[in-house]
Regions:
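Membrane-interface helix-loop-helix regions
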Residues: 84-153, 189, 196, 290-296
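Specific transmembrane alpha-helix
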Residues: 44-60, 152-169, 180-239, 245, ...
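Interfacial loop-to-helix transition and helix-capping segments at the boundaries
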Residues: 2-3, 32-44, 142-155, 196-219, ...
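Functionally critical transmembrane alpha-helices in membrane proteins and complexes, commonly lining
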Residues: 3-62, 78-85, 126, 324, ...
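Aromatic-anchored segments of alpha-helical transmembrane domains
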Residues: 14-22, 138, 183-195, 267-279, ...
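Membrane-proximal cytoplasmic C-terminal regulatory module of class A 7TM GPCRs
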Residues: 314-316, 375-403
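Juxtamembrane transmembrane-helix termini
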Residues: 44-78, 83-109, 221-228, 302, ...
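Alpha-helical transmembrane segments of multi-pass integral membrane proteins
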Residues: 213, 217, 260-374
Length: 403
């Protein structure tokens, strides 16, 4: 995994967790006043871009048969589904606990909130069934149910399948690039047509369904092919064997210059991305450019060098990246328990609640990563390897197992 991309994923997961607490759950105060945090839901689109790039880099040359595609989907299923099931269960238990407390207090004449205890369809078995079938985010329902960030996990799973089918059906590289570009173009067209007749509040990327994921995921695929093309270009004379005797100072100066250009481009793209996220509510249809700028940021980080890349290499951000999926899916459980406190406590004490929230999210994420995410991912690799090779003796932890 490219370390700068890993760190970027961690930052995005943290921002989404803060958004759901301070903005979505209306804790208010700082940092909810920051425009970037108010629109941090957009960083889900960054996740999709990263996923598209990673899938293309890891699998575009390996998905050459139905058996390979089946093994790939097994890996992706075991990567996503076990943690989804566990965190959906923890959210259900948290809601059950909170509602039970409300019910007990209601019998004592103490009313909390406007809703009656258990006065909503959170435990509707039909909704839970859609959740467990990973259909909650594809557009069948519009409700935010259970572990509501998991809508994007639902979309991502079906994007994985779309990607595998595309790689199987279209073999020439140019045709794959054209197909991916067509999917991106169709997704843009979908939003433009939808927004042309939608009420003003609905003219936003903050929607659910496959088109939003397709728009960003297949940009990630295009990034991979573009970077691969760049890497395959003939090297300049400075990098050719004929220039082997060139002065070391000149070579170092050229490398320093290239690094300076890359760093400047990374900073500019990052600042532009944050500016557009901050101004999303004012952009109208121009907000469609935001996923494209995210794609540019990812492209500039792929070399894993430059000033922004070095920042993302730092230990705290690498830790966030390693635990980003767990952070993304566990934070709603913690938020369910602390929600009333975050809204009730004024500043500056609210910041203590925020620190407690993050501490609990990080702690829970460490547990779920160690006991759910990582071991089940390894089991998926073992099963996929058996399917692909017919080797029934594959074992967990075998370093030869593909990722």
């Amino acid at each position: 995994m490219i370390r700068s991309i890993e760190g970027l994923r961690g930052v995005a997961a943290l921002l989404v967790a803060l958004f759901h607490a301070y903005v979505y759950s209306r804790w208010g105060g700082f940092p909810a006043t920051l425009g970037v945090l108010q629109h941090a839901w957009l960083f889900v689109d960054l996740f999709f871009v990263i996923s598209g790039y990673v899938m293309a880099a890891a699998y575009s040359d390996r998905l050459d048969s139905g058996r390979a595609a089946f093994g790939y989907m097994i890996r992706r299923f075991f990567r996503l589904y076990p943690l989804h099931v566990v965190t959906t269960a923890t959210v259900l238990l948290a809601v059950l606990g909170i509602q039970t407390v409300k019910l007990v207090l209601a019998h004592q004449g103490i009313r909390i909130g406007r809703e009656e205890p258990f006065g909503f369809d959170f435990f509707d078995l039909k909704l839970l069934g859609l959740d467990m079938l990973l259909l909650q985010g594809v557009g069948i329902i519009r409700k935010e149910i259970h572990n509501y960030p998991s809508w994007s996990i639902s979309v991502e799973f079906w994007l994985y399948l779309m990607f595998a089918l595309l790689m199987l059906a279209v073999r020439p590289r140019v045709a794959r690039i054209a197909a991916s570009a067509l999917i991106v173009g169709m997704s843009v067209a979908y939003f433009l047509v939808y927004w042309s007749s939608a009420p003003e509040p609905l003219r936003t990327l903050d929607t659910r369904g496959l088109p939003r994921g397709m728009l960003s995921f297949f940009q990630g695929v295009l990034i991979y092919y573009f970077y691969r093309w760049l890497a395959a270009r003939p090297k300049s004379a400075a990098g050719s064997p004929a220039a082997a005797g060139a002065p070391v100072v000149a070579s170092a100066a050229a490398m320093t210059q290239r690094m300076g250009v890359l760093s400047a481009a990374q900073v500019a793209a990052t600042v532009l991305a944050l500016y557009l996220v901050d101004r999303q509510h004012l952009l109208g249809t121009a907000q469609l450019v935001i996923p494209f700028v995210f794609a540019l940021v990812v492209l500039l980080l792929v070399p894993d060098r430059g000033i922004v890349a070095r920042l993302l290499h730092t230990r705290p951000l690498q830790w966030l990246g390693l635990h980003s999926y767990s952070i993304y899916l566990t934070h709603v459980t913690v938020l369910t328990v602390l929600d009333w406190l975050g809204r009730a406590v004024p500043e500056p004490a609210k910041h203590l609640v925020g620190l407690l929230y993050l501490a609990l999210v990080f702690g829970m994420s460490m547990v779920t990563y160690r006991f759910v995410e990582a071991p089940w991912r390894e089991r998926g690799k073992v099963l996929a390897a058996r399917i692909e090779s017919g080797d029934t003796f594959a074992r967990e932890g075998d370093p030869s197992l593909p990722r």
